[in-house]
């Protein structure tokens, strides 16, 4: 199979950076959305929940096209970000991170939401009765008790980001050194006669990274589970 080339190491580094940035940027919003869905009832909640989980059921190409329309240089959001803040997503690695974040966001929200919903609300009520503000109760009780779900959701989203293909190639294309992540590079190598060995090497790396992420999620969840379950 041979050793990895410098270009292949660069592809791996770019993929890790894209996946890491996507989860770091989406985690605070995912925690907020999960908390709202788990603890509040409001008109339109079912619709809001459906919209959050829409990337799970939509073809990734549709998600990528929607991102291109919204965040492209001439899109309503992308144009403002470019002119006012100099932020460009289309055909940049930051766009790949955005696509990964959008595709992994439902997984993160779902894991955190289930973890929050499993917490006995009497604990939160007792803390509020003793004078704790909602923010204090969330930070000192709800968030620590939901940490296993946060870890699971984060690592699942990270693994999803490593494997993202359809939305990424539609939104930011397949530019070597800029947006060519692991799945896109594997696809590229399979299209050339001499690329089978490189495709195999990168496929093995992708499998290993995904297994490490899942194993780490399981191990950390057991370590921080406040119930002490093994």
Functional labels for PLM-detected ranges:
Residues 3, 64-101, 171-175:
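Membrane-interfacial helix termini and adjacent extracytoplasmic/periplasmic loops
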Residues 72-76, 150-188:
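Non-cytoplasmic
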Residues 44, 106, 110-124, 128-129, ...:
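C-terminal transmembrane helix and the adjacent membrane-cytosol boundary/short C-terminal tail
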Residues 19, 23-31, 35, 61, ...:
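Hydrophobic positions within alpha-helical transmembrane segments of bacterial inner-membrane proteins
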Residues 21-52, 65-67, 115-117, 122-123, ...:
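Transmembrane-helix boundary motif in ABC transporter permease subunits
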Residues 24, 109-112, 116, 120, ...:
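Transmembrane alpha-helices
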Residues 1-7, 171-211:
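Interhelical loop and adjacent transmembrane-helix boundary motif
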Residues 1-24, 36-45, 82-86, 188-197:
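Periplasmic/extracellular loop-to-transmembrane helix junction in inner-membrane transport proteins
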């Amino acid at each position: 199979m041979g050793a990895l080339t410098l270009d292949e190491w660069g592809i791996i580094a770019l993929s890790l950076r894209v996946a890491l940035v996507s989860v770091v940027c989406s985690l605070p919003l995912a925690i907020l959305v999960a908390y709202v869905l788990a603890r509040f009832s409001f008109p339109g909640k079912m619709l809001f929940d459906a919209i959050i989980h829409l990337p799970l059921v939509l073809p990734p190409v549709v998600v990528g096209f929607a991102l291109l329309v919204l965040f492209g240089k001439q899109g309503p959001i992308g144009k403002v970000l470019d002119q006012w803040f100099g932020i460009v997503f289309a055909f940049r690695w930051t766009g790949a991170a955005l696509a990964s974040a959008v595709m992994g966001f439902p997984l993160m929200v779902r894991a955190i939401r289930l973890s929050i919903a499993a917490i006995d609300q009497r604990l939160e009520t007792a803390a509020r009765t003793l004078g704790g503000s909602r923010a204090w109760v969330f930070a000192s009780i709800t968030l620590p008790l939901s940490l296993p779900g946060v870890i699971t959701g984060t690592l699942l989203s990270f693994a999803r980001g490593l494997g993202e293909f359809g939305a990424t190639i539609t939104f930011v294309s397949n530019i070597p050194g800029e947006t060519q992540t692991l799945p896109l590079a594997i696809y590229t190598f399979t299209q050339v006669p001499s690329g089978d060995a490189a495709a195999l090497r990168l496929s093995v790396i992708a499998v290993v990274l995904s297994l490490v992420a899942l194993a780490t999620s399981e191990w950390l969840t057991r370590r921080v589970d406040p119930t002490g379950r093994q």
